[in-house]
Amino acid sequence: MRLSIKTCTLDMPFAAMLDFCVAQGVQAVEIGTGNWSGAPHIDLDELLGSETARQRWMDQLRRRDIALCALNCSGNPLAFQKDWEVTEKTFRLAKLLGVEKIVMMSGLPAGCPGDKTPVWITTSWPPETQDILDYQWNEVAIPKWKELVRMAEDCGIRQIALENHGMQLVYNPETLFRLREAVGPLVGMNLDPSHLFWMGG
């Protein structure tokens, strides 16, 4: 197992960030590509559009013997088109870079057709919560996640690791297994204990 780090919190240029990682003994990096993760160390459009740019970017990693373990596009692809587009671009770039793991969040739909605000339901009462959940899962999440999984498979992605974060449709084992049963085992969990702490775990 390699010691790795999610780099988007490191406020420094790409090369300087990699040098810092080497100095700390970090052997692999998870690069944020946009949405909530930010993208301080990668330009999705540039790398998608230029093999030369991809080669130059990857050479920075190779020279330092740092592996690219995952791309992170955490956002809400179930509610916002711009987040869906970044997710789609991230999958396409993963194929071009040979990356097989994506870290992201499940997303959270609105509560009904025509609503624009994501609604996080964590209780079974009052009864209307079940109508909201039925809409979120069966009308939005499962169809869209089937599409995402097909897209991921077409791009050679073998694992989508969902953060167990609050204000997401998938945030605990029960909701993860519900999604896996619907879309298959390509979807798993990126276990972040810090999320459990603030959710009272």
Region locations from a protein language model:
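Short polar catalytic/cofactor-binding loops
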Residues: 7-14
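Catalytic domains of carbohydrate-active enzymes, especially glycoside hydrolases
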Residues: 14-37, 97-101
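Hydrophobic faces of well-ordered beta-strands that scaffold small-molecule active sites
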Residues: 3-7, 29-31, 68-73, 102-104, ...
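Bacterial c-di-GMP phosphodiesterase catalytic domain signature
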Residues: 201
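N-terminal amphipathic alpha-helix/helix-capping segment at the start of soluble metabolic enzymes
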Residues: 1-4, 61-62
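The substrate-binding groove and active-site-proximal loops of carbohydrate-active enzymes
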Residues: 42-48, 72-81, 135
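Active-site acidic/histidine proton-transfer and metal-coordination neighborhood
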Residues: 16-19, 56-63, 77-191, 198
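Glycine-rich, proline-tolerant flexible connector loops at the mouths of alpha/beta enzymes
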Residues: 30-58, 109-113
